[in-house]
From Swiss-Prot:
Superkingdom of origin organism: Eukaryota
Organism expressing this protein natively: Ectatomma tuberculatum
Any single GO CC term annotated in Swiss-Prot or TrEMBL for this entry: membrane
Record key words, sorted: Disulfide bond, Membrane, Secreted, Target cell membrane, Target membrane, Toxin
Subcellular localization(s) per the UniProt record: Secreted; Target cell membrane
Record-stated family: Belongs to the ectatomin family. Ectatomin-Et subfamily.
Tissue: Expressed by the venom gland.
Listed name of the protein: U1-ectatotoxin-Et1b subunit A
A Pfam family matched in the record: Ectatomin
SUPFAM superfamilies linked to this entry: Ectatomin subunits (SSF47401)
Primary subcellular site in the record, as a coarse category: secreted
Subunit details: Heterodimer of subunits A and B; disulfide-linked.
Disulphides: 14-35
Length: 39
């Protein structure tokens, strides 16, 4: 389903998000929280 596809995309994006999180804060921090919930 759509939810599964979104989760798969987020899982792939998480390593990238974590790299960005070291440079940026705010939105990326929120995304990181989402990533930690997925794993």
């Amino acid at each position: 389903g759509v939810k599964e596809k979104l989760l798969a995309v987020l899982r792939k994006a998480c390593p990238v998000i974590e790299k960005l999180a070291k440079k940026c804060h705010g939105t990326v921090a929120t995304l990181k929280k989402a990533c930690s919930l997925i794993h």
